[in-house]
Amino acid sequence: MKTPKVGFVSLGCPKALVDSERILTQLKTEGYQVASDYDGADLVVVNTCGFIESAVQESLDAIGEAMSENGRVIVTGCLGKDEDKIRQMHPNVLKVTGAAAYQDVMEAVHEYVPAPPKHNPFIDLVPEQGIRLTPKHYAYLKISEGCNHRCTFCIIPSMRGDLVSRPVGSVLEEAAALKRAGVKEILVISQDTSAYGVDTKYKLDFWNGQPVKTKFFDMCEALGQLGIWVRLHYVYPYPHVDAVIDLMAQGKILPYLDIPFQHASPRVLKLMKRPAHSENTLEKIKLWREKCPDLVIRSTFVVGFPGETEEDFQILLDWLVEAQLDRVGCFTYSPVEGATANDLPDHVPEEIKQERYERFMQVQQQISAAKLQKRIGQTMTVLVDSLEDEYPVAVARSYADAPEIDGNVFVEDIDKSTIQPGDMLEVEITDADEYDLFAKLIKIKSV
């Protein structure tokens, strides 16, 4: 009997990527092979995104391609919450499940492609760290599912439910397994990382025989003992985040915070129903930088939210200039089906949204470029992601750069035979542009 093969298409954010990794790991554990193309697959699983309209369309297109090329398709992920929409366009998909519905996906696979008999996972070994879709030297670590907030532009709680935190012992054991597998950088992700453990009332758990609370600070402190890069994403600026800045100042975890501020106008933040909107974020940023001068802050913002006036937008620009954030992403407001913000009055015309986006990016590009210019002459440690095919250049990142969303450090004039992805290098920064740094190699620190 031939080994059954399952194709897999993964769309969406890093949290969805982790869901895909978990399903793929279970498939491999049960003896399925993962097909490299549509033709060789007995069926195809498409893990979708449903957050904004462009992502919905991309997901529907991916389902259509899988149906056209293979014809036997199971749909999962955030868009799976809207089965009617999927079946209107693709009525013949085999099954539709929601986000993080691992067991439902596996049951659907079993129904249409039974698992191979006599499979022994202890002989057909799956790596301890599971199947990963990222390069070997970094990995995403998802610590919770869902969110307790009800931001008016977001439908994540309706797709993924309220906050459910993983036991801290499970989180730390996965992190340790990743380190043993050679991972040099862990990126901590969730919908609301700094709320970790709230739902469990910070329940006590155990790791390596030691008691650890299921709590944001305690988890970060334990991760900091692993001796690898630990990067925090999706952190809301709650008061208890201040203590984690101390860990950064001590070199326990990377001095990098990804905080989705989204706006600065109190009126717009209230319309958005953002948590911590009443916090004086500028004072908080100043305090953090006093504690940890190397701190890098990345954030995302929405311009053109319903009801945003020119005065609101100017408040945002003024805040941006004063905050001097290192890395920033910006989006024009896009209606999301099911979001309560759709019902707000005074929607902003598209041409004004675009004009505000361009003004916003112009201000931030000047800030980012000036900050990168100050790096010239500094010595930094970087992690190599890849090597250029045609040039003697390593594409790397410093502590200030998360993969895919931030900039790179291009290490020039190297001997490519001595360097590979996953190596840590010590470099001197020689030049900069608006987003990236350029450097020369001082020495290879670790391989």
From Swiss-Prot:
Main location: cytoplasm
Keyword Transport: no
Reactions it catalyzes: L-aspartate(89)-[ribosomal protein uS12]-hydrogen + (sulfur carrier)-SH + AH2 + 2 S-adenosyl-L-methionine = 3-methylsulfanyl-L-aspartate(89)-[ribosomal protein uS12]-hydrogen + (sulfur carrier)-H + 5'-deoxyadenosine + L-methionine + A + S-adenosyl-L-homocysteine + 2 H(+)
Every TRAM domain range: 373-443
Enzyme Commission (EC) number: 2.8.4.4
Alphabetic keyword roster: 4Fe-4S, Cytoplasm, Iron, Iron-sulfur, Metal-binding, S-adenosyl-L-methionine, Transferase
Keyword 4Fe-4S among UniProt keywords: yes
Binding residues annotated for [4Fe-4S] cluster 1, in chain numbering: 13, 49, 78
Cofactor note: Binds 2 [4Fe-4S] clusters. One cluster is coordinated with 3 cysteines and an exchangeable S-adenosyl-L-methionine.
Enzyme class name: transferase
Compartmental location: Cytoplasm
Annotated Radical SAM core domain residues: 133-370
Positions that bind [4Fe-4S] cluster 2: 147, 151, 154
GO terms for MF: 4 iron, 4 sulfur cluster binding; aspartic acid methylthiotransferase activity; metal ion binding; protein methylthiotransferase activity
Family matches, as NCBIfam families: 30S ribosomal protein S12 methylthiotransferase RimO, MiaB/RimO family radical SAM methylthiotransferase
Role played: Catalyzes the methylthiolation of an aspartic acid residue of ribosomal protein uS12.
Family annotation (HAMAP family): MTTase_RimO
Name used for this protein in its record: Ribosomal protein uS12 methylthiotransferase RimO
